[in-house]
């Protein structure tokens, strides 16, 4: 078995990302990171890069967003030596919960964390997700973390889709992006 060698995480993303035209709607090119995450060498480089930045940002916890943020966030937290917060979509946790609603193109959604059993007061959280597009989900996660008494010390994503305003929306803390979208 040949193990691919990549110069860095950016090269791994560029080599392994799958582009799917007209998904989820005509005119959109979906950038599927599944092959990137499935490649052990690529995944390792990405986790190392995100963990290095999480430590630089002073993370006490990594906040992984449902669902791919769970995969990335867990590995990053392990590597950085922090705890992991699984920031869930509404309805996945038993009550009581902290909840933060946010707008979608066609409605609303919410993110939740348990209201009991977590000691987040005065802690620093780095939020981790796979893709930054409009920034709506990460912004809602920030508000949720703040409602729990913690501070978001930074955001870390694998891929940023340029031109959708996500970077501007998240201007309250440092943003780490490994690779910009190739289709922007």
From Swiss-Prot:
Belongs to the purine/pyrimidine phosphoribosyltransferase family. One of its GO terms (molecular function) is adenine phosphoribosyltransferase activity. Coiled coil: none annotated. Catalyzes a salvage reaction resulting in the formation of AMP, that is energically less costly than de novo synthesis. Its main location: cytoplasm. HAMAP family: Aden_phosphoribosyltr (MF_00004). NCBIfam families: PRK02304.1-3 (NF002634), PRK02304.1-5 (NF002636). It comes from Corynebacterium diphtheriae (strain ATCC 700971 / NCTC 13129 / Biotype gravis). The keyword Chloroplast does not apply. It catalyses: AMP + diphosphate = 5-phospho-alpha-D-ribose 1-diphosphate + adenine. It is found in: Cytoplasm. Pathway: Purine metabolism; AMP biosynthesis via salvage pathway; AMP from adenine: step 1/1. It is an enzyme of class 2 (transferase). One of its GO terms (cellular component) is cytoplasm. Pfam families: Pribosyltran. Its EC number is 2.4.2.7. GO terms for biological process: adenine salvage; AMP salvage; purine ribonucleoside salvage. This is Adenine phosphoribosyltransferase. Keywords: Cytoplasm, Glycosyltransferase, Purine salvage, Transferase. Homodimer. SUPFAM superfamilies: PRTase-like (SSF53271).
């Amino acid at each position: 078995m040949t193990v691919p060698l990549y110069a860095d995480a950016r090269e791994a993303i560029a080599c392994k990302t799958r582009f799917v035209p007209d998904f989820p709607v005509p005119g959109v090119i979906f950038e599927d990171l599944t092959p990137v995450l499935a490649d052990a060498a690529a995944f390792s480089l990405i986790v190392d890069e995100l963990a290095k930045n999480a430590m630089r940002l002073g993370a006490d916890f990594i906040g992984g967003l449902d669902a791919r943020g769970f995969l990335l966030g867990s590995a990053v937290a392990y590597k950085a030596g922090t705890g992991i917060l699984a920031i869930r979509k509404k309805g996945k946790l038993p009550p009581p919960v902290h909840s933060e609603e946010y707008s979608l193109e066609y409605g609303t959604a919410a993110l939740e964390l348990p209201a009991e059993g977590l000691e987040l007061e005065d802690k620093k959280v780095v939020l981790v997700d796979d893709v930054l597009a409009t920034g709506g989900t990460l912004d809602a996660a920030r508000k949720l973390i703040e409602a729990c008494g913690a501070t978001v010390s930074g955001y870390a994503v694998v891929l940023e889709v340029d031109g959708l305003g996500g970077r501007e929306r998240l201007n309250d803390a440092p943003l780490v992006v490994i690779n910009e979208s190739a289709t922007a």
